[in-house]
Amino acid sequence: MKTLPLSLLFAACAALSACADEGPAEVELSAGEPFEGSASSGIAFGELTARPAVVVREIIVAGSISSSVAPGFDLDNRVSNATDREACGKKDFTSPEGTTGIDNQLGAVWASVYDLAGVPVEGLVRAAVNDGKLALVVELDGLDDPWNDDNVTLRLFRGYNEKPIIGTTGVMQGGQTFEVRPGAPVIVAENASIVDGRLRLSADDYYLELELLAEAFAINVINMVFELQYQEDGTWNGYLGCGVSVAEISDIARTYAESESRIIIPLLPNIADLRPGSDNKCTYVSAVLELKGIDAFVAR
């Protein structure tokens, strides 16, 4: 029995490579409060320039902490209760820091869904990350100070490294070099700043490519928020929140895992909380991924 569709539901937000009919494109994202400025620099090696970056080396689903507390973001700019039709009656969470309006309905059922998966989802995603298939890279063009820098251009994309070096702890080592994956569009935030070590990006609608196991899929991701926080030990921790399509995940389940579709398809409408349709039923499910990154370089 395949567990791929369950993994796609949890990891759809992580493969940030928007689909395009033609070659690479640059798409400007809206930037959150920490952003103001622009820069360009790097270290030249022959015809290539290596620029500082962060590569995400660990991705796990961020489950709820309790019935009312969960990590994540306010993806729909509203605080919903059980009577809110715009959220299809799904009550928002409060973050551990006390922020209200947190959308993370997948996290609320994560434990039960994890038990139903034949292969642990985290193991499947970790294998894809370590193989370089889910190399999520943030280029920090013009970075001078990872704690506070008012003149940085951010580029977010799926990176390419034929064989990343894996350390003794089972995750990618730092200091490795990545390229933009051939044909992958680059999402750009110019005039950006790092404030107190925090990066934050947001995007409304993107059609993303995701590759897990031997399958490649395109999934529509909405209301994406990406945030990383620099740490004293030189690593980066953060979250990625987004909405994933009920219809698309259901179609993938029917096609690639008929047995699992009997579990997945009835579950999704019951936790959907974003973008209600004409029938007042929500068409997307909010999800949050916890990210851990390490320093890297981008060669251009």
Regions found by a protein language model. Give the residues of each.
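Extracytosolic secretory-pathway proteins
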Residues: 22-300
